[in-house]
Amino acid sequence: ATLGGFKEEEYTRDCLKAVDDARAYGINTIVDATTNECGRNVRFLKKISDMTGMNIICSTGYYFQAESAYAYWNFRRGFANIEEEIYEMMVTELTKGIEGTDIKAGVIKLASSFNEITPTEEIFFKAAARAQKETGCVIITHTQLGTMGPEQAQLLTANGADPSKIAIGHM
């Protein structure tokens, strides 16, 4: 991943403090829902986990279209089965590891646009439902300003996702 400007020493100090603060409340697991293209850094998360003993669960998935890598996926949609590619990526990151490591995602993160689920976002939701059916993992979502939560749930469950393993965010 390209993470220009990543200040590892400073961020390590900040994260160690955040973990200490969380641990003071009895928290022993943190979910980092940063998506693949939004700066997810699994090696850094593992470093913090190893230093502190905190369980840190990272995600696989993509953010909403306006702030994501969707230009690439929209281009690929013209000549490839991107639902299959996205599904395979998610299952690989959940079962084998991320970016050539043995660090596995523990959740799928999805997002939709304000007042709509775009056609490409819909493909991600369908791929995620398939990946959840295969792996049993939780799907967490992001809604823009609280819109589209029920529609996200309907789309996921219509494609076979287990509603007891779906968390809709920001409603």
Where are each of the predicted segments found?
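Active-site core of metal-dependent hydrolases
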Residues: 134-171
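Glycine-rich phosphate-binding "P-loop"
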Residues: 2-11, 110-116, 139-144
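Distinct, well-ordered alpha-helical segments
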Residues: 44-45, 71, 118-124, 146-160
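Alpha-helical scaffold segments that flank or form the walls of functional sites
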Residues: 2-34, 38-55, 83-103
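Acidic-and-aromatic substrate-binding clefts and catalytic sites of carbohydrate-active enzymes
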Residues: 35-41, 117, 147, 170-171
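Active-site gating/metal-coordination segments in enzymes
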Residues: 47-50, 55-57, 61-138
